[in-house]
Amino acid sequence: MSLRGKDIISISDIKRSDLERIFRVASSRFQGDELKGKIIAMAFFEPSTRTRFSFETATLRLGGNYIGFEAAQSTSLAKGESFSDTIRMLDSYADGIVVRHSLEGAAKLAAELAEAPVINAGDGTKNHPTQAMIDLYTIWKERGNLDNLTYGVLGDLRYGRAAASFLKALNLYSPKKVYLICPEGLRPKQELLDSLKMPWEFSDLKDALPELDVLYVTRVQKERFPDPSEYERVKGSYKVDSSILKDAKEGLMILHPLPRVDEISLDVDSTPYAYYFKQAANGVPVRMALLSEVIP
């Protein structure tokens, strides 16, 4: 089924066949003209580096152009204009809208308001579908396969939308097992656990590490904690460094959606396990592939 003109709000909106078509396009994508004469609106109501820059780069490399903002304070939202009116205005100017917002459901609301396709660049704590595409593409590109692997997901599994989307994306495949590795206060919400279709269990890093083919690490999402004291209790409670990796399986891939704070030590960067900078670089070809598939 074609994604042309479709909204991409959750990774659950994507079929495995769609995802693997995006992977194939991304693996050969360096330049193109699919967006020639098209304008993409970048509606970033929340800070971003990699996501915004890679969407902008992807648009330019496909021959398109972009408009937008990187902070709500620089728009009429600062004067009291509503989110709805802002989206309607962007819809009248652009052929597609990329939305990032701190509030859950913002991208879905934008999709209901706009005629142009809306791509969710991360909203709330549940959805970051294009990050999940990049994560899975990185594994697929290196391994050629995502099935029958053992995954560990380490970090903030309660407030981290990248981790939540990664886990939901794995539902499209057949992992051997998934280990959820997190402090007690950062365990996933029950809704996410109930949605998982693969074998999973809670573990600690030391016990799970020797089995892992992929370790997906995320930072503690300080900005999403409702109570600052809750953040203080869990910050710094986990760290991957080169000493713990002595027990790692040969060929282990360590991924991180970035930015990192202190959850992966700098000494890991020079090990053969570090794939997170390759992962970040994959943002441009994957988003090029997605834009070329979605924008009418």
From Swiss-Prot:
* Annotated binding of carbamoyl phosphate, by residue: R50, T51, R100, H128, Q131, L258, P259
Q: Which reaction does it catalyse?
A: carbamoyl phosphate + L-aspartate = N-carbamoyl-L-aspartate + phosphate + H(+)
Sorted keywords for this record are:
Pyrimidine biosynthesis, Transferase
Annotated Gene3D superfamilies: Aspartate/ornithine carbamoyltransferase
EC number(s): the record gives: 2.1.3.2
Quote any Pfam family the record assigns: OTCace_N
PANTHER family for this protein: ASPARTATE CARBAMOYLTRANSFERASE, ORNITHINE CARBAMOYLTRANSFERASE, MITOCHONDRIAL
Give the family, as the similarity comment puts it: Belongs to the aspartate/ornithine carbamoyltransferase superfamily. ATCase family.
Q: What is this protein called?
A: Aspartate carbamoyltransferase catalytic subunit
Report the source organism.
Korarchaeum cryptofilum (strain OPF8)
- The gene that this protein is the product of is pyrB
